[in-house]
Amino acid sequence: MILVKKEEIRKILFQVELYRRKYFGHQFRTIGLTPGQGQPRILKNLLDSGPMTQKALADLCMLDVTTMSRTLDRLEEAGLLSRKSNPSCRRSFLISLTEAGVKKAEEVKAIFKEADQMICACMDEDELEMLYASLCKIRGNFEQAAKKISEPSDEKHREK
């Protein structure tokens, strides 16, 4: 059995993140999106889940409401989404994709599918299940740590 140094795992996770950002950054810029602001996730989630409130979308995309608001403004200006009064709560809006937004979201979905295939191509089912379980554990550890250190401004953004 090979003994893996813990620091090597951290380094590999960091490298994976860097390459992931580079790959997705290029892919999404090619179709006219800004990936660092969550635009692809917003479009994909609206395509998959349909119209929803800004807060529900922010929670689903794991974005604070300030970032979400600015990003929605940009996507609306680009003609990719619209905001309409929410009939069940007059103080909020329902965010939905326009026809152009659906087309762009389909492009995003294809990019994600290609990435999924690239991630899974080098592993069999058992390895994928083991990787999934391990990544869930790592995510859980970081999630717990993040909850302990969340800044007051983070909570303020989530309450809206």
Question: How does the language model describe each region?
Answer:
Residues M1-L33:
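N-terminal leader segment of winged-helix/HTH proteins
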Residues S49-T53:
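Short capping segments at the starts of secondary-structure elements
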Residues Q54-K55, T66, D73, F93:
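Residues within helix-turn-helix
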Residues A58:
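The alpha-helix within a helix-turn-helix
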Residues D73-E143:
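Charged, amphipathic alpha-helical coiled-coil/dimerization segments
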